[in-house]
């Protein structure tokens, strides 16, 4: 059967249920960190700051190798052109054995009561998976403050804290 591959596509929408353009391949599992038992790019989340767009996605299989990758683009460019997106060569968030958080992924972004960006994601608190990993109940929701680096890019770190 070979590897099962999951890619991310982009298209302009005519409505909530209808495409206005043909779908375009945005990213496919290119790097080793995206190619665990399954070759996966899935679960995109979008974050915007100024003119910069950051699309995070989950990669690899759902065990300890599950992680978050990121693409970035400038708003105002043709987002349907894959050449306008730059893919990070390394995951922006991955398992942290010191913290006991494994396989972070499938994230989204929300704002807190002060308008600050917060990443919501799931991860495991154990490294061993019993049974089918997709149906194993050991995935929990986590919140992570998004801190912005001096280069204007988001920094995802388990030690992130907001300044009060």
Model-derived features: positions:
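Carbohydrate-active catalytic/glycan-binding domains of CAZyme proteins
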Residues: 1-164
């Amino acid at each position: 059967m070979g590897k099962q591959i999951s890619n991310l596509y982009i298209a302009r929408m005519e409505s909530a249920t209808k495409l206005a353009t043909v779908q375009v391949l945005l990213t496919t599992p290119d790097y080793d960190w995206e190619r665990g038992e399954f070759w996966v790019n899935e679960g995109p989340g979008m974050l915007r700051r100024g003119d910069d767009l950051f699309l995070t996605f989950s990669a690899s299989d759902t065990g300890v190798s599950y992680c978050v990758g990121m693409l970035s683009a400038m708003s105002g460019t043709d987002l349907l052109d894959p050449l306008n997106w730059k893919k990070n060569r390394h995951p922006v968030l991955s398992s942290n054995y010191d913290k006991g958080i494994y396989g972070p992924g499938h994230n989204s972004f929300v704002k807190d009561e002060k308008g600050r960006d917060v990443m919501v994601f799931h991860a495991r608190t154990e490294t061993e998976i019993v049974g089918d990993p997709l149906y194993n109940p050991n995935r929990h929701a986590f919140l992570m403050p998004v801190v912005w680096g001096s280069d204007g890019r988001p920094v995802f770190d388990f030690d992130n804290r907001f300044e009060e």
